[in-house]
Amino acid sequence: NEIKELADEELIEIEKILTDLSLLAAQSVEDILYDMETLVALDFIFARAKFARSYMGSQPIFNTEGMIDIKAGRHPLLEKHTVVPVDIRLGEDYNLLIVTGPNTGGKTVSLKTLGLFTLMGQAGLHIPAMEGSRLTVVDDVFADIGDEQSIEQSLSTFSSHMSNIVYIMNHATPNTLCLFDELGGGTDPTEGAA
């Protein structure tokens, strides 16, 4: 019985201590929030630096003229040592790029790399590419990249692609990066068009 009373007293004392600490913390809530925001900012800076270092990233050079020049870019989610680097140039002589090639030739990965690099760069991240790579400032990035290639779903896949394309065309501006993979693919399931 005495042990139970001591345990109850201990709980009451713990509650008093926690109440006092809570009141002290409440008096400094603005300082605590400021410190927390500072730590979050520092953590973000260190995370960006760690990412840049681990992927041998470089700071992209930004322009507002629509020029993109990615030199030896490597998709950040693929194994560093097995990725074939890609060079992508747009905006100087042309602003449309059509990529053709065999299946598993890297077309989709190149599109995804361009989209990711654009978003990463504008978020203040370094990109896994050579120094001197240039990116343009965009107001939006739209992508219709169909990773699903099921013949049974060809009609619904095609309809989905068309809906995405209509949405993109209605919302794109001259400063929008639009990425389309296998545009018009899946129109005839027997052909397996890509």
Where are these regions (language model features)?
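Amphipathic alpha-helix face/heptad-repeat signature
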Residues: E2, L6, S28-D31, D35-T38, ...
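ATPase nucleotide-binding head domains, primarily ABC-like/P-loop NTPase cores
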Residues: Y55-M56, N63-A194
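Phosphate-binding P-loop/Walker A region and its immediate neighborhood
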Residues: L23-E79
